């Protein structure tokens, strides 16, 4: 999106430094930097302010229940919760996440929550079956956060790009690059975001 002249801001609400490290690598590799803001605690007012000055605001919340996560849900437009379907531990977190989302939707009824299946190794039948089974389970009951149709494969290019501070659309040549780009483009399209 940054490469297409979209104004993008990242709000870092997680205390680890992954996003800052990623953005520093972007700069070192001559890629367009993405403004990163940091805020902790109740982040709802900062989100409202930042939404006014950019086209796309990405909020990086901790991967566990937190004040940051709960307050972000009250003002966010879209929630993506990433789950590796073959990991029982990750799939089991959906009960708790769904509860938090449904509570937040009482305040923010426009919130669109989605489950994104990630790191699916399509060469392993067990991984494919786990994705199919979890998809079916979630779709059987609308109380669950619903899964997106788009799925992200376990491709080395995603990690390699990230390690360079890039996204797959910043990369010129790599194995499985066209597949990775297509998956990201399908995700953006499904979410109604023009990359």
Predicted stretch roles:
Residues 183-195:
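C-terminal alpha-helix
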Residues 9-10, 59, 81, 115-117:
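Structural beta-sheet core signal
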């Amino acid at each position: 999106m940054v490469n297409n002249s979209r104004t993008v801001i990242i709000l870092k609400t997680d205390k680890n430094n992954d996003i800052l490290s990623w953005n520093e690598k972007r700069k070192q590799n001559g890629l367009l930097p993405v403004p990163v803001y940091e805020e902790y605690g109740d982040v709802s007012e900062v989100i409202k302010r930042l939404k006014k000055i950019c086209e796309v605001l990405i909020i990086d919340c901790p991967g566990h229940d937190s004040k940051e996560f709960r307050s972000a849900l009250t003002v966010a437009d879209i929630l993506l919760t990433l789950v590796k379907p073959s990991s029982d531990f990750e799939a089991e977190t959906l009960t708790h996440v769904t509860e938090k989302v449904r509570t937040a939707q009482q305040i923010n009824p426009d919130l669109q929550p989605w489950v994104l299946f990630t790191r699916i190794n399509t060469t392993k039948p067990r991984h494919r079956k786990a994705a199919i089974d979890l998809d079916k389970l979630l779709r059987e009951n609308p109380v669950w956060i619903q899964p997106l149709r788009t799925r992200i494969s376990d491709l080395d290019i995603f990690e390699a790009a990230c390690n360079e501070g890039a996204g797959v659309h910043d990369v010129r040549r790599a194995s499985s690059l066209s597949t990775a780009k297509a998956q990201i483009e399908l995700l953006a399209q499904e979410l109604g975001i023009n990359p």
